[in-house]
């Protein structure tokens, strides 16, 4: 799945609200988590702690840094450093990912100005409408995007395209997407890779049309991913699990027969579980009645929670059963790219009682000012909507600790991340836990044949939300968490 861009220096969220390189003066700087840097250095004595870093608030975790001496090319959309030819034109990773998500999710944006906003590295996130408009005007080819939403274009040789102003207007208004949907619905959906298959999830509950289309794209991607693997010959080291390649034969109307879990599947899941720290979070979250929590205090608490959760992910890496199979460089690269997703996944599952219980009680004692409410960005509103939807999905599924451990490993072993030295080995490890998770869910939840794809479809959503949260200005995070936690806790109590 495509990863979202990191926020540009000084860039803000949507809706024209300004972003910050550091917390504003009203907020205390987050606590440094230098211990995380030391912990990662311990993974390989040869590093001597000499690593570049990516900030978490003001803390650091190691990350590989591209060579500045590489040839500099400019993105035709925003002027940032280009990384290659993407969908027909030279562009950066950020605009590439933005264009792909906009087309795959059939997004329809609005411009609050005159539809001529400046596109630059610092301002590209302020107006999604004008950003997509410039992508189309500069010749980005939406037909080069794979219809299943998976990485890799359909035809890398396709160059920029020239389309009429009328067609651009149809795309920007969403009319083009509606016409395509009607076309495919009238021509059947026998091909998993066709857009018509996306209509199959239209009757699923979702908080809005954007989430519904996103869910259908993810299901289509899941089907293509599954078919790719199921059509392959079974590798020798996977043949010990005979049930793994029978998923395509399952019918929602005819649950599979009960069977036993393969001993080696059980063993690998047990090893994953042994790596997990399921003890309650140690960060104090209890506040006396009647105390009014300030924005600065809530922000500091969120930073301490993020520090503890990040520390647990680093400790988890060192206990993984495949720890010796990958290089330290790859582990550093993987953690730098997925730490937000790992924290979000754990917060929605194994630590959800504390996050949506104790932390929700703290956020309830925080009252945002009128200015904070007025300045809240559209980007933050989208994150809120998707987080609430994802919370209810996890609450409905009641994800077990074993499923959580498998999902976490699958998400972490993302071979599409740039800078990896062992992508093929990562792919094999990813498949291993993909199959084991499928084996476990089919064994334990015999009468829920759709459970495994439902679990897997949560992972792209987590990646998308984690990427979007990076673009939310820091001073808006206390309000964001207050709204999400209040909504989720209130709806759960009503149930």
Swiss-Prot record:
Residues 180-192 have a biased composition (Basic and acidic residues). InterPro entries: NHR-like_dom_sf, Nucl_hrmn_rcpt_lig-bd, Nuclear_hormone_rcpt_NR3, Nuclear_hrmn_rcpt, Znf_hrmn_rcpt, Znf_NHR/GATA. Zn(2+) 1 binds at residues 75, 78, 92, 95. GO terms for molecular function: DNA-binding transcription activator activity, RNA polymerase II-specific; DNA-binding transcription repressor activity; protein homodimerization activity; RNA polymerase II cis-regulatory region sequence-specific DNA binding; sequence-specific DNA binding; zinc ion binding. Residues 202-214 have a biased composition (Low complexity). The keyword Isomerase does not apply. Pfam families: Hormone_recep, zf-C4. Residues 9-18 have a biased composition (Gly residues). Residues 187-268 are annotated as: Sufficient for interaction with UIMC1. SUPFAM superfamilies: Glucocorticoid receptor-like (DNA-binding domain), Nuclear receptor ligand-binding domain. Keywords: Developmental protein, Differentiation, DNA-binding, Metal-binding, Nucleus, Receptor, Spermatogenesis, Transcription, Transcription regulation, Zinc, Zinc-finger. Residues 1-34, 145-165, 177-214 are annotated as: Disordered. Residues 264-495 form the NR LBD domain. PROSITE patterns: NR_LBD (PS51843), NUCLEAR_REC_DBD_1 (PS00031), NUCLEAR_REC_DBD_2 (PS51030). Zn(2+) 2 binds at residues 111, 117, 127, 130. Orphan nuclear receptor that binds to a response element containing the sequence 5'-TCAAGGTCA-3'. Acts as a regulator of embryonic stem cell pluripotency by mediating repression of POU5F1/OCT4: binds to the DR0 element within the POU5F1/OCT4 promoter and inhibits POU5F1/OCT4 expression during embryonic stem cell differentiation. Required to restrict POU5F1/OCT4 expression to the germ cell lineage. Involved in the regulation of gene expression in germ cell development during gametogenesis. Belongs to the nuclear hormone receptor family. NR6 subfamily. This is Nuclear receptor subfamily 6 group A member 1. The gene is Nr6a1.
